[in-house]
């Protein structure tokens, strides 16, 4: 019997003496014993969990990198941990220095990691994921399963345990396992920074000499939380800002000014509905595969005080594009804004084009996986593939453990079982890539 179960039984046994009129001192003794037994049970669970994690190369690697904080623009420490691990396990490693994002004051000397077996600097198969996380850092911790103990149901919690250090750890172990059996397989690893902040790391790799024309690689396996399913594609991503200009005045005499907020509200109302309006009526496109295009007015600013007519207002909008091109979507949005404001010159719209991309279709020609279509974005479109004139076209796969539904939240977590299954999934994708030649 587990000590925790014994504690529960002891707790239940205190009810009968009370009903029989026993003195409260008996209850105090029983409660004291309950606390002691519960503490012993917790200690026993912690010792068991520690042994399970420490005895597994996969779980111990995952713990090592999850215990290192690596919020975007602060990835050098986890990068060094991975460089050390990969070097100790037979990989040649290169650091690809990546400047921090312009909107961050970090002084971190961060880098992408490019790794390959000694003597194979141009691998045919690349497994890649990201080593940065969203803020805030949440400490790594373990939770024993409820009821009968099942190793697979141990829960691993903390920032990055899912997105995407689970993929990083599982990829490495899968690669090491394959190389142990087939040491001549040209297998490489690419771990990038800043995926969570616009994909700076992948853009840096894409623009580097390692991304050749034609490519020396024929398969890319990307790691993100996909519930152990193979992703057949994800929506496109488009962002834009709307600004309104007004004239400030005392709120008691609003006719002396012009409200920027009143100017922007009908525009935002129109924007908010663009995903629900048919294209023929001026809406954004939908598709059978990705569903409807969705828009999120994520930030809205305006005004100085409640008793002042606002002279400025602005909004930032994110679009998850289900079909069509970026240019078409921008034109639809521009027309919708112009119609909503009657062509007012007080309204302006801007697009940060460098971060926009259309829907991304991915390869799924490997048997044995359930398929999934996702709404979230990745840095897959940030890697330009120069295979236009090549006889062999590059395959792109997206797979990983955990679910995106908890990935950025306070309860980010996955089970030991899912993490271990991911190693088998990546191994299956590697095997398929090897068969391609």
UniProtKB/Swiss-Prot annotation:
Zn(2+) 2 binds at residue 163. The active site is at residue 195. GO terms for molecular function: metal ion binding; peptidase activity. Zn(2+) 1 binds at residues 163, 196. It is found in: Secreted. GO terms for cellular component: extracellular region. It is an enzyme of class 3 (hydrolase). Its main location: secreted. The keyword Cell membrane does not apply. CDD domains: M20_ArgE_DapE-like_fungal. The keyword NADP does not apply. GO terms for biological process: proteolysis. Its EC number is 3.4.17.-. Glycans are attached at residues 153, 346. Its cofactor is Zn(2+). Keywords: Glycoprotein, Hydrolase, Metal-binding, Protease, Secreted, Signal, Zinc. Residues 1-20 form the signal peptide. Belongs to the peptidase M20A family. This is Probable carboxypeptidase HCBG_00059. It comes from Ajellomyces capsulatus (strain G186AR / H82 / ATCC MYA-2454 / RMSCC 2432).
């Amino acid at each position: 019997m587990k000590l925790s179960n014994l504690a529960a039984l002891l707790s239940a046994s205190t009810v009968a003496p009370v009903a029989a009129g026993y003195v409260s001192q008996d209850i105090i003794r029983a409660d004291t014993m309950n606390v002691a037994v519960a503490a012993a049970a917790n200690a026993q669970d912690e010792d068991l969990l520690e042994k399970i994690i420490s005895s597994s190369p996969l779980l111990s690697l995952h713990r090592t990198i999850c215990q290192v904080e690596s919020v975007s623009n602060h990835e050098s420490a986890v990068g060094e941990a991975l460089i050390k691990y990969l070097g100790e396990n037979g990989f040649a490693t290169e650091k690809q220095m990546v400047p921090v994002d312009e909107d961050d004051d970090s002084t971190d000397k961060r880098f992408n990691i490019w790794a390959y077996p000694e003597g194979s600097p141009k691998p045919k198969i690349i497994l890649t994921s990201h080593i940065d996380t969203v803020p805030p850092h949440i400490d790594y911790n373990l939770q024993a399963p409820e009821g009968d103990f099942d190793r697979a149901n141990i829960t691993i919690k903390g920032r990055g345990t899912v997105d995407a250090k689970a993929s990083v750890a599982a990829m490495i172990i899968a690669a090491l396992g394959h190389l142990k059996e087939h040491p001549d397989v040209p297998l490489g690893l690419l771990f990038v920074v800043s995926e969570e902040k616009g994909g700076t790391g992948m853009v840096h790799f894409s623009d580097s000499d390692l991304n050749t024309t034609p490519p020396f690689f024929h398969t890319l396996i990307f790691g993100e939380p996909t519930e152990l399913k193979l992703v057949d594609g994800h929506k496109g991503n488009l962002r834009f800002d709307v600004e309104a200009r007004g004239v400030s005045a005392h709120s008691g005499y609003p006719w002396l000014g012009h409200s920027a907020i009143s100017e922007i509200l009908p525009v935002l109302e129109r924007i908010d509905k663009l995903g629900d309006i048919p294209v023929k009526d001026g809406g954004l496109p939908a598709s059978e595969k990705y569903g409807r295009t969705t828009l999120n007015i994520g930030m809205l600013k305006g005004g100085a005080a409640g008793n002042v007519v606002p002279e400025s207002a602005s909004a930032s909008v994110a679009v998850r594009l289900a079909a069509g091109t970026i240019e078409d979507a921008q034109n639809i949005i521009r027309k919708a804004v112009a119609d909503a404001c009657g062509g007012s010159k007080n309204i302006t719209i801007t697009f940060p084009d460098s971060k926009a991309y259309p829907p991304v279709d991915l390869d799924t020609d490997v048997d044995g996986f359930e398929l999934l279509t996702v709404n979230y974005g990745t840095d897959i479109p940030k890697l330009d593939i120069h295979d236009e004139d090549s006889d062999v076209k590059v395959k792109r796969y997206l797979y990983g453990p955990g679910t995106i539904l908890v990935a950025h939240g306070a309860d980010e977590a996955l089970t030991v079982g899912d993490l271990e299954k991911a190693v088998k999934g990546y191994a299956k994708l590697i095997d398929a890539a090897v068969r391609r030649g």
